[in-house]
Amino acid sequence: MKKVLLILACGIAAPLSYAQATPKWAGKAKKAVFSIVTYDKDNKIKNTGNGFYINENGTALSDYTLFEGAERAVIINADSKELPVLRILGANSMYDIVKFNTETDKKTIALKSASQPASIGETVYLLPYSTQKAATCQTGTVTKVDTIGDKAYYYTLAMTTNEKTVSCPIMNANGEVLGLIQKNASDEAKESYAIGATYGASLSITALSLNDMSLNKIGIKKGLPETEDQALVYLFMASSQQNQDEYITTLNDFLEQYPNSADGYIRRATTYMGFNDDEHNALADADLKKALEVTANKSETQYNIAKLIYSYTISLGDKKPYGDWSYAKALSIIHDAMQADNQPIYTQLEGDILFAMKKYPEAYAAYEKVNQSSIASAATFYSAAKTKQLIEGTDMNEVIALMDSAVARFTKPYTSEAAPYFYERAEIKAQTGKYREAVIVYDTYFEAIGGGGTSAYD
């Protein structure tokens, strides 16, 4: 810490040497400005710079360059208190700006964004980081204002700045923040530039941010989207791009931000179950119970839990199940859901579970109900046909009729999606001695997969 403060102290004197004015609001406003130290993967100091708070929740802005390649970062506030950077909340490498949040130890002093952009010729104030009691400011004037987005601006200033003032705030006469100073080509340059604070505040994490190159070049943990729906899409994307431990961390962050999300608990339970051990299964079981506690749609949550336990039991093989997880438990849960809200998709799952339990007549009865509903499809008729085929004493013509209904769901020209159904239909016809009809269906199958061959019965 002493080493860090020594490095920072060397940079304090530079902006003070050309201080020209001290507005009344500067004494309080300077408490929003802090210094930043970033560290590399070996925990060695990578860069030092500045930043400032834009709200009392610890949200802040700084330059992207300072954070690029960093694995962690801390801020040292005006009271010389060191606080860790917790999450990156948005970044834009082209405009060299990053949004993040830090841990807070008490009420945070934050700068209020200006409601209107600065005008050309207006006097502005550069507020540097300082641990000194007295606040000092450097003045300059606005020479150009460019619009870079919705209520977002880029300022050209008649002001000489140096490396030590990068990411310090530019204020108007009312003590409102206009932007943050960007790195200049030369310390002797007569012009400086500032990116609008409102632009920085608008940066966010979206559902697609996992593929954002600018964000991925920062090793510090990222935040989540600000709406639950977007955050759930983010979780879906993360599930295929992160390993189990990373994904668990993301899920933990999600549930911290959205503690009443039944979907979040079910997704974390699913991930825990992927570890295939009793320790994680116990955590999964607790999450499934929590999902039922917080859900706004109990039947839907019961459906998702029943489906999860059903899938778990299928994958179990000859292994001993965890606790009471079984087909019977999954069936009991889906029956509870159906009593409150008898959706066809719930009946479909009921049929799947009964089929796995080898209760074929009951499974067929469930599939028949589905086939008379709005979600009837080639797949549901196929399920009914395969189940009917396994019931002792079944007339195979009934099975063929069900497969006829399955393929009737497709229209010409047939595609590869229809091919498996035509193949199964042909197989059943061949098994019942209807070889000529089977050949015709096999030919349709070959057409569907784009082949020119014919069946073995030619």
Question: What is each stretch, according to the model?
Answer:
Residues 21-23, 180-250:
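C-terminal cap/linker of serine protease catalytic domains
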Residues 21-22, 39-57, 63, 82-84, ...:
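A conserved glycine-rich beta-strand in the N-terminal activation segment of trypsin-fold
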Residues 21-25, 108-154, 161-166, 181-193:
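Flexible, gly/ser-rich surface segments that form the specificity/activation loops bordering the active-site cleft
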Residues 55-127, 132-136, 151-154:
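Conserved active-site neighborhood of the chymotrypsin/trypsin-like protease fold
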Residues 225-278, 318:
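Alpha-helical segment of the N-proximal tetratricopeptide repeat
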Residues 241, 275-278, 312, 324, ...:
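Structural motif corresponding to the intra-repeat A-B loop/turn of tetratricopeptide repeats
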Residues 270-274, 307, 314, 352, ...:
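Residue-level recognition of tetratricopeptide repeat
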